[in-house]
């Protein structure tokens, strides 16, 4: 794993780091970088660390040329491991909060203060929900709306008795102190893909941490343009299996 030099943007009451995760997002990561740089002009107290999961399409070159700090995986390991890398960096470098966001231009950096505002109010984990009033899900395919608005929250309710409007957004803020709880094992070998975030959510719920949702945007590209690497059915199962495995005691 190659670590490029990190320079903090400035000091703030909470040390906050934004971590987009990326794999083969050429044509999209450029837009993420532009939006991040615009955001940082008005919010210089935030830091950034991009995690590139060994992209092979030139995304790494774009990130390198951007001047933003980044970590490069030497081999592709999966989105879950990329998130773990971001979390480990945040914890090891004494950040108070990490914001995880997509590297495919579906999330808007300008909405990050909504997440942080609820953290500052005392919450430990804040989810950006596309389905709350004020949120949006432009161009989202119908079947994905059904899955993310109804099926995913139902599974969460079934296994934890907690209700949320959006549990598959991938855009959230979490206190690093939560991530250092010994009951949360970030090194579980079975967590390599999208189930990593579901594992975190399950643990945060069942350990009694304070969770909030805020309106957020999840913007999909126009029809005909590739919008996800997740495969229907198998990808959804990878996301949801963490709740069943943990609830049934099959995994820790």
Segments (PLM) and residue ranges:
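A conserved acidic beta->alpha catalytic loop
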Residues: 52-60, 105
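Conserved donor nucleotide-binding strand/loop of the catalytic core
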Residues: 49, 60-93
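Short beta-strand/loop segment that forms part of the nucleotide-sugar
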Residues: 20, 44-55
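Acceptor/aglycone-binding surface of glycosyltransferases and processive sugar-polymer synthases
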Residues: 75-77, 81-89, 109-194, 221-230, ...
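Hydrophobic helical membrane-anchoring modules
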Residues: 1-14, 161, 185-252
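Short beta-strand-to-loop acidic/aromatic patch adjacent to the donor-nucleotide binding site
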Residues: 95-106
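N-proximal low-complexity "stem/linker" segments adjacent to membrane-targeting elements
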Residues: 1-35
